[in-house]
Amino acid sequence: MLNSLDLAGRPQDTRVVVAMSGGVDSSATAALLKSQGYDVVGITLQLYDHGAATHRKGACCAGQDIHDARDVAERIGIPHYVLDYESRFRESVIDSFADSYALGETPVPCIECNRSVKFRDLLATARELGASALATGHYVSSRRLADGSRALICAADRDRDQSYFLFATTREQLDFLRFPLGDMTKPQTRDLARQFGLSVADKHDSQDICFVPTGRYTDVVERLKPNAMEPGEIVDLNGRVLGSHPGIVHFTVGQRRGLGIASRAPLYVLRLDAARRRVVVGPREALRMERIVLRDVNWIGDGALDRAVGDGLELFVRVRSTRAPQPAWLRAVKGGYEVELVAGEEGVSPGQACVFYDAAEGQARVLGGGFIKSAAPRSIAEPAHDDAASPALAAMRG
């Protein structure tokens, strides 16, 4: 007989480690599992703070969060541990964040944190503690497949769905992970936290990158990669110099404001040439890309990736966390994989993720994804499939 976490055994005989960030989501997760009788252990990762800040309420974002996690653990009566992962986090997340910006990319540090820290090191720690699962407060779901493995599923609350940030999760990790909030809405989570009397029930959600609480990510990049702050030229598609800039780190693909150049028509950042320290700008129509070259592809769909792709796999992709999935074709090419966007997409930025889904809406299954290495318009891409032959495009158009 399986318990509510789809694990064999009674809840009281099942140890579950909960990754507690100090926010309402992970706190409600811990309280819910405790109320269901599980042997819950809370762990908070100290990622970017030092010394007394971990013990002093309100010292900084990380210090406050650790204080809140401890408070919740005490309230619900579970053991709680704080693990110092600062060095690991700096090497795996912060340094790669700065490297990515220096290369002219727009990184997503939350993906790297989940991939390199939470779902690898923390998961290993949970196993060492004798846990049967690691639970988090992410808004995603998972379900058991016929072969016993687990699939990653979008959250019921579409506005809160975090599947984009978890595409790099491996099959082995999915087998051990649980997401109790996947079928809940944010208001329901807050109501649950109030029912348990948690002090964080009305705590504001974090809006910034956790290690950049001021929102000035350029400060981090300047400290670690000062060459990314070197000035350069702003040029048009023909290479004509239109102006100058204080460093490519200040720009991202699709940006319109803050260019500091006069033009009769609106200009947008089309790409960043880190080698020549150039910001290439042009009209909005030049932003539309149809072909995406991927790197570090992770596949969690059925079977082996190459067999699933074959001569081309029709699916849906999301190229930014805030955008809806759209029809696409995934193809194997020499040295990697490419995605052809059926209808094109504006502002496709290297460094962002391209996440695969089996449907455009609802609780779709996440099939994997990869990081965007480069993008190109249709004029230099492979010929697209005829729209009439694409059921995915028909589904998008309704």
UniProtKB/Swiss-Prot annotation:
InterPro entries: MnmA-like, MnmA-like_C, MnmA-like_central, MnmA-like_central_sf, Rossmann-like_a/b/a_fold. Disulfide bonds join C113-C210. ATP binds at A19, M20, S21, G22, G23, V24, D25, S26, L45, G137. Its EC number is 2.8.1.13. CDD domains: MnmA_TRMU-like. One of its GO terms (molecular function) is tRNA binding. HAMAP family: tRNA_thiouridyl_MnmA. PANTHER family: MITOCHONDRIAL TRNA-SPECIFIC 2-THIOURIDYLASE 1, TRNA 5-METHYLAMINOMETHYL-2-THIOURIDYLATE -METHYLTRANSFERASE. Catalyzes the 2-thiolation of uridine at the wobble position (U34) of tRNA, leading to the formation of s(2)U34. Belongs to the MnmA/TRMU family. This is tRNA-specific 2-thiouridylase MnmA. It comes from Rhodopseudomonas palustris (strain HaA2). The gene is mnmA.
